[in-house]
Amino acid sequence: MTAIGSSAAKVDRYPNGVGLRMFVAADTAMGANAPTCVINYLDTAGGAGATTTFTSTASATIGNLLNTGAAANKYNPFLPLAAGDTGVSDIVSLVWSGTAHASGTVVIGLCKPLWTIPVPATGIYTKVDFVNALPSMRKIPDGANIQFLMFQTGATTSAGTVWVDFDYGYN
């Protein structure tokens, strides 16, 4: 793995990483086993030695977040940061502890959450107004790659349909 600071890739919008959060997704189908994943990262001051861990998901399919679930040492959807950290400025390493996955590759995602919309159960309609209610009119930087990161609760089902209608104003 090549650290962001050692490659051509740069965290250009948030150079010190304030507010950036991590998640780990399967880039290819993951094999059996559910090892512990240890990620070492640099905090917003560039300090080394910050780590976060989670128990991976055995046989996860492409696109699934490996750090989610209802079991112990799972987090939805973002990995916890070390005490006092407010973001991630660089990823240093990812190490599997214990019996590694039999196969597969992962992506460590760094993202800036703009808002969270709860979907408490399948079939429940949820609407959020970002003009007249809080959080009001979050700034979306030019060139941003807007994506929706969805994780299901125990009260939702994989057969449920999710529709998203996203309107925005440009200044």
Where would I find each of the regions flagged by the language model?
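Polar, enzyme-active/binding microenvironments
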Residues: 1-171
